Swiss-Prot record:
UniProt-annotated stretches for the region Disordered: 233-275
Pfam families reported for this sequence: PTP2
Region forming the signal peptide: 1-18
Organism: Encephalitozoon intestinalis (Microsporidian parasite)
Record-level GO cellular component terms: polar tube
Name of the protein: Polar tube protein 2
Function: Involved in formation of a polar tube through which the infectious agent is passed on to the host cell.
Domain of life of the native organism: Eukaryota
Length: 275
């Protein structure tokens, strides 16, 4: 027994004195979820899961927002169309005369009637006879001027836009005629020569399409307007007797829906009238 213990002690002392150092071991990587020191790495798991959940939530949120925006735009468009059709189906007021019939599905006829109504009833052109000149206006813009010059030395008076003392002294038009953009006479005021006793009204502008040609006396219109135009534009050097000079009549009417009379006359037989 003593011999065995002595052998063991000798071997242990020899191992310590030899100074043998053990090689360092490579560290073992710790993976997510791998137990470490008897405990699971739950903190890393929660962090990675949170990033993934946030990404998925962001994608879902963007998708829901896009769908909600699309649905909102569609509802707004449907509401706008519904409101438009509802208003159009009512049509304008009866006295306005802008719509021929109620248009529920389509509005082409109603819109067309409004355009025609505006074209027929709006005063676009004006012929004004002042002193020795006749002017043609489009709205308030002068686009043509005819001067009845005797031997070329008559002064031309141009009215200014701004009101001044000079404007008050300018001669006023002796006669004026108003035309719509399709050439119909829609208004006239002033003194016009009267060569015949036949009373004739120029055709009134109509606010509807179908009844325009039926209600309009075309012959009367041509006879009245051509005479008015010829007398306003062309200055005739006709020697008249005192009795004939008195045959002037003052007329004024408004063509915009009013029914006031406007007396016209036929061109003279000498053929100088403008047709």
């Amino acid at each position: 027994m003593l011999l065995l213990l002595s052998a063991v002690a000798f071997v242990s002392a020899t191992a310590v004195q030899s100074g043998v150092v053990s090689q360092p071991t490579t560290p073992i990587p710790i993976l997510p979820g791998q137990p470490m020191g008897g405990m699971a790495n739950g903190c890393t798991n929660k962090k990675l899961d949170g990033v993934e959940i946030m990404r998925r939530n962001m994608v879902e949120c963007q998708k829901r927002n896009a769908e909600a925006t699309k649905a909102m735009v569609e509802r707004a468009n449907e509401k706008a169309v519904e409101t438009f059709n509802k208003e159009v189906s009512k049509g304008p007021q009866k006295e306005s005369g802008q719509c021929i019939e109620k248009a529920v599905q389509g509005t082409d006829r109603c819109i067309l009637a409004g355009i025609i109504d505006k074209a027929v009833n709006k005063r676009k052109y004006r012929i004004s006879d002042v002193e020795n000149s006749t002017s043609l206006y489009r709205g308030d813009k002068l686009i043509a001027l005819i001067v009845n010059v005797d031997y070329g030395l008559q002064p031309i008076i141009k009215p200014k836009k701004k009101k001044s003392k000079i404007m008050a002294n300018l001669p006023q038009p002796k006669r004026e005629m108003y035309f719509n953009q399709i050439g119909q006479l829609v208004g006239a005021k002033g003194t016009f020569p009267q060569d015949n006793k036949d009373e004739c009204k120029p055709c009134e502008p109509k606010k509807t399409v179908e009844t325009a040609s039926e209600r309009c006396n075309l012959g009367c219109e041509l006879k009245g307007t051509s005479a008015l135009i010829s007398k306003a534009i062309q200055k005739k050097e006709i020697k008249e007797s005192p009795k004939e000079g008195d045959r002037n009549t003052t007329q004024e009417y408004d063509g915009e829906g009013s029914a006031e009379d406007a007396e016209g006359q036929q061109p003279s037989a000498d053929g100088e009238g403008l047709e």
